[in-house]
């Protein structure tokens, strides 16, 4: 078990950060501090969108910041961006307590759902946050946590983006009371969280396609998703527009369930310059509406 976890950690730590600068960083102190990036265009009294960016297993908040590289696009769109860190497990690795599959390997009782809600409440107290535009993006374990929040806190979360994560295998564990737009992004060559689904230490997680099918049913979408053009260029290491878009239509309350498949993409793709714009555009076009 320990050796398997170390192997997983080594795979996840192979990511290469991308550095960039911010407009203004505000650090919230406490037992679990987090960083809020305030856009240069922010005006008190004008409700702004809020995005929470979640790192993967073994990574941390600064890594999520540099890897997703949302800074420029978020600033241009007037988005408040939050970068929190998970808890440390017995091996010293940071993780989120999301679904049974990933990545609370110590069976800890840590409540990350409550922690993320407290972040939303704290930022909303100090800044003008639009309650209809609260979003989460996560990579790997962070993607699992994004799905968890969509399942358990659907009244607060408008939409999520999961890169190389997955939702609950047991659909009885995901019974949201409100529709949530879901974008699943996954590489076909992911060797950590398989595109076709699988198990982590005996706990199942659904495939990328099954994940959006589950949300298609939850959001009462049309029977079958359809491919949408144009293809996208999300991975700068793969030539051309390598990513196909599969989209459910006719979903409840203007929501969506989409799969962006990175052909030959790995667990931690080298994200292109257009990645941030594409995912932020998805989020902003899916605010929370009355069901």
Give each language-model segment a name.
Residues 124-128, 132-180, 191:
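Primarily recognizes the serine-hydrolase "nucleophile elbow" in alpha/beta-hydrolase
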Residues 191-196, 203-207, 270-272:
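Conserved alpha/beta-hydrolase "acid-adjacent" motif
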Residues 21-23:
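Boundary at the C-terminal end of the N-terminal hydrophobic targeting segment
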Residues 181-185, 206, 218-291:
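C-terminal catalytic histidine-bearing segment of alpha/beta-hydrolase fold enzymes
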Residues 7-17:
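Bacterial N-terminal signal peptides
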Residues 52-58, 164, 186-187, 263:
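The conserved beta1-alpha1 loop
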Residues 27-41, 45-135, 145-148, 152, ...:
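Serine-hydrolase catalytic machinery in alpha/beta-hydrolase-like enzymes
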Residues 86, 188-191, 198, 263-266:
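Acidic beta-to-alpha connecting loop that harbors the catalytic carboxylate
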């Amino acid at each position: 078990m320990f050796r398997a976890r170390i192997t997983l950690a080594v795979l996840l730590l192979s990511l290469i950060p991308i550095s960039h600068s911010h407009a203004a960083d505000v650090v919230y102190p406490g037992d679990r501090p987090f960083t809020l990036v305030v856009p240069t265009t922010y005006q008190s009294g004008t409700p702004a969108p809020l995005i929470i960016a979640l790192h993967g297993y073994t990574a941390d908040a600064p890594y999520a910041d540099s890897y997703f590289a949302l800074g420029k696009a978020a600033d241009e769109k007037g988005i408040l961006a939050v970068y929190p860190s998970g808890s440390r497990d017995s091996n010293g690795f940071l993780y989120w307590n999301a679904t049974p599959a990933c990545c609370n390997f110590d069976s800890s009782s840590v409540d990350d759902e409550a922690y993320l809600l407290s972040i939303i409440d704290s930022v909303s107290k100090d800044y003008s946050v639009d309650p209809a535009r609260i979003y989460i993006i996560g990579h790997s374990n962070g993607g699992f946590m994004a799905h968890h929040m969509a399942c358990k806190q659907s009244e607060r979360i408008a939409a999520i983006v999961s890169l190389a994560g997955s939702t609950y295998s047991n659909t009885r564990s995901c019974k949201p009371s409100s529709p949530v737009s879901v974008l699943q992004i996954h590489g076909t060559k992911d060797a950590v969280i398989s595109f076709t689904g699988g198990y982590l230490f005996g706990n199942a997680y659904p495939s990328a396609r099954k994940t959006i099918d589950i949300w298609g049913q939850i959001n009462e979408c049309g029977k079958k998703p359809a491919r949408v053009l144009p293809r996208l260029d999300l991975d700068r290491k793969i030539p051309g527009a390598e990513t196909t878009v599969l989209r459910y239509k006719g979903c409840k309350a203007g929501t969506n369930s989409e799969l962006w498949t990175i052909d030959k993409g790995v667990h931690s793709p080298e994200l292109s310059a257009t990645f941030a714009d594409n995912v932020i555009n998805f989020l902003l076009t899916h605010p929370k509406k009355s069901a």
